[in-house]
């Protein structure tokens, strides 16, 4: 078993890490780190458990340690659910010795830090060697993208491989859990929609092109098509919905696009990794699907569901669809865990 820990263990994504790591066949959760306010106390005493499942008994009495490299003990991999401002300061310190699989945004766009979706760009893990050489670390940092970016890019990948994408427009309807438990006051979101999420549109527009780019002699060359995003917070607990419009340079048959999505598999599926969904993208034909309440938990929340796939008659060589992905599973903790499973398998 590989000993692992969670940084930022008391927050919503930290709790999702704990839930997904409980009874994991390869990883044993031995360390929970949080702020100095929580350090030295049992996890069950300091964590206000938010998830709609019971807190695992294995962590209830586990003593929380400070978020400091000297405090985490004998671990091999650390999963980071830290806020971006904290992550930027402390993740490099941990990476001097440990493997850090980070969900935080702080280091994502560093030129020597792999930003990875295992089904999309596993070859970017080659940057680990570059990172260690440049920074003199024994460990390293690997990051996963923004939650909305992950769902979008998983659906774009089979299309990108088969056609030439000219531009992508995406409008997101994002669950409140993406902002954390205290992120959106109930009076601000009930009977309402908030048409702005700070920094979200920029993340989608840059990360998507980065992920679909090429690694050339240690340098990522982003994909060259345009991405335009508009992001909205909606009164849904879990599960981001995205309306996607794609313009291609090529003529296409919509049935071929559907087949490409349905048959899409990546390295995690070939390797049979524990957290890998059987199908990264599940295509549904019902007119009223996908819906977050009905589809966010597809394959344990690790698959993205696509529906309303159709040609767009208003524009040449264009298509549209709607997707739903679980933002704290596939879009956060599950993404980091799948990255770690891949690293554990191939490195």
Swiss-Prot record:
Pathway: Amino-acid biosynthesis; L-lysine biosynthesis via DAP pathway; (S)-tetrahydrodipicolinate from L-aspartate: step 2/4; Amino-acid biosynthesis; L-methionine biosynthesis via de novo pathway; L-homoserine from L-aspartate: step 2/3; Amino-acid biosynthesis; L-threonine biosynthesis; L-threonine from L-aspartate: step 2/5. Keywords: Amino-acid biosynthesis, Diaminopimelate biosynthesis, Lysine biosynthesis, Methionine biosynthesis, NADP, Oxidoreductase, Threonine biosynthesis. This is Aspartate-semialdehyde dehydrogenase. HAMAP family: ASADH (MF_02121). Residues 281-299 have a biased composition (Basic and acidic residues). Phosphate binds at residues 108, 203. Its EC number is 1.2.1.11. InterPro entries: ASADH-related, Asp-semialdehyde_DH_CS, Asp_semi-ald_DH_pep-lack, Asp_semialdehyde_DH, NAD(P)-bd_dom_sf, Semialdehyde_DH_NAD-bd, Semialdhyde_DH_dimer_dom. It comes from Methanothermobacter thermautotrophicus (strain ATCC 29096 / DSM 1053 / JCM 10044 / NBRC 100330 / Delta H) (Methanobacterium thermoautotrophicum). The active site is at residues 147, 240.
């Amino acid at each position: 078993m590989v000993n692992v820990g969670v940084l930022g263990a008391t927050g919503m994504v930290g709790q999702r890490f704990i839930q997904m790591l409980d009874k994991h066949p390869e990883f044993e959760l031995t360390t929970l780190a949080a702020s100095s306010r929580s350090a030295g106390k049992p996890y069950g005493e300091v964590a206000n458990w938010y998830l709609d499942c019971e807190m695992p008994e294995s962590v209830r009495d586990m003593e929380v340690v400070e978020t400091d490299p000297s405090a985490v003990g004998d671990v091999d991999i650390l999963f980071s659910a830290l806020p971006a401002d904290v992550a930027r300061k402390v993740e490099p310190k941990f990476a001097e010795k440990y493997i850090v699989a980070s969900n935080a945004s702080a280091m994502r766009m560093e030129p020597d830090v792999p930003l990875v979706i295992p089904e999309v760009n596993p070859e970017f893990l080659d940057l680990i060697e570059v990172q260690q050489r440049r920074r003199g670390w024994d460990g390293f940092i690997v990051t996963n993208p923004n939650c909305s970016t992950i769902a979008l890019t998983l659906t774009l990948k089979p299309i990108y491989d088969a056609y030439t994408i000219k531009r992508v427009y995406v409008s997101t309807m994002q669950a409140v859990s993406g902002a954390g438990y205290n992120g959106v006051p109930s009076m601000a979101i009930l009977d309402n929609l908030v048409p702005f999420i700070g920094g979200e549109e920029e993340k989608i527009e840059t990360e998507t092109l980065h992920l679909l780019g090429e690694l050339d002699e240690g340098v990522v060359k982003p994909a060259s098509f345009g991405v335009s995003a508009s992001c909205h917070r909606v009164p849904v607990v879990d599960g981001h919905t995205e309306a996607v419009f794609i313009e291609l340079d090529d003529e296409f048959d919509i049935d071929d696009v559907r087949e490409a999505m349905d048959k899409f598999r990546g390295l995690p599926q070939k390797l049979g990794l524990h957290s890998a969904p059987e199908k990264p993208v599940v295509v549904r034909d019902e007119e009223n699907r996908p819906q977050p309440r009905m589809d966010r938990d597809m394959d344990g929340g690790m698959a993205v569901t696509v529906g309303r796939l159709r040609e767009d008659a208003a524009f040449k060589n264009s298509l549209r669809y709607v997707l739903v992905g679980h933002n704290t599973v596939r879009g956060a903790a599950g993404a980091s865990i799948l990255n770690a499973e891949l690293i554990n398998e191939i490195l």
